[in-house]
């Protein structure tokens, strides 16, 4: 077994296009990092193409986490998940979260997981990475 044994893998995280909120995303990034992941934070207002590029440009990506606080950016989250699924890139799971996001919405847009807060996001990320 080779590679970086100190890491559970890489987590790409960002707030979806059109959304400039970062406090929730930052908390999730900190929790996921402290759980043992390398975190690549793409920032806010991230277009779907940038999420895909980040998966292509980073090694051992296990999680892509999409955050959104505004109901108006939920379509962007849906498009991001769709683009990631259609990209044919493999080996990672997609997590979504943010105030307007529900388990039902996450399921509807084919995300692999929904978490309501930063603590549960870290737990779920570990579960998904080891699945």
Question: What role is predicted for each listed range?
Answer:
Residues 1-25:
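Long amphipathic N-terminal alpha/beta scaffold segment
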Residues 112-118:
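Short acidic-hydrophobic, aromatic-tinged amphipathic segments that line or gate anion-handling sites
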Residues 124-131:
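A charged, well-structured terminal subsegment
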